[in-house]
Amino acid sequence: MGPERDSIDADEAGYSLAHLAEVLFACLDATGARSVAEIGAERGALTRELLAWAARGGARITTIEPLPGPEILELVEEHPELELVSEESHDALRHIAIPDALIVDGDHNYYTVSEELRLIDERAPGAELPLLMLHDVGWPNARRDTYHAPDRIPEEHRQPLVRRAALVPGEPGVAHAGLRYEWAAEREGGPANGVLTAIEDFVERREGVRLAIVPGFFGLGIVWHEDAAWASAIAEVVVPWDRNPVLERLEAYRVANLVERYRHAQELGEIEIMRRERERHAEQEQILRAMLASRAFAWGERLSRLRKGGRPTFTREQVRRALGEDA
């Protein structure tokens, strides 16, 4: 799940894993996957493509989404074969049948991803590890946590937070404008911070587990065990994409352009707010000046003096001071 939209179209911005469908489905085909679970469906763009892919070969699709939106519920109505698990991933992974492949695109922080990987590994260790494809292993989530609901993360596993944080490439802190997240880590980098950090730590602690990175559309991490029956087939698919320097440069340019558009949209929004404030103040000033010139105001001031023993509730002098004029 991506940042707040700030008036920029989500599909155009490239938030959905559906933009990496060619790589995803090539990997699924290489493993001969007959069951796929998707963690985090958002608006269902990838879910719809997964269902179309599954229909061609008779595969089963499970979507794990604790708060399914109307698009997902509509897909369930249209496709009774789609299994919807309305639970947090850490709960669902304890009891669902471990599929042949998992696509992980849920809450993008170290704790959540580490726990998802741990739970999968506990139930399918070694060469039984399913194919894992994880989104947002590139900037900004590679080395920085973001949170949908920080209170669900144990305090000792939360980074210091900033609300409505604006993130910009090359800035390890936060900026005035950029890709804006409701909750993000105050700083980029360091231990136990970010999606890619979580995956690298998982891979480093386990023999025979490999990681490839497709550096496009916020980055796709592909994890598999080298002793899996389909390991060589997966390697053949992903090696040309893995950390491809041309793709890395293209993604850097794409992100820079996207951030600039976000910044421009936010600055235009701020200008519009200032314009409305000026209009409101001008209207208030016009009303106050009309009041000063009215006989009704003069009578109201005199009546107030009489009722308040010579100390009226309001006076011309007070209104003039409010207008910035000498009393």
Question: Where does each model-flagged region fall?
Answer:
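Class I SAM-dependent transferase core
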Residues: 1-16
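SAM cofactor-binding core of SAM-dependent methyltransferases
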Residues: 14-93
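Conserved acidic residues
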Residues: 34, 100, 130
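C-terminal substrate-binding/active-site "lid" region of AdoMet-derived donor-dependent transferases
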Residues: 111-231, 242-255
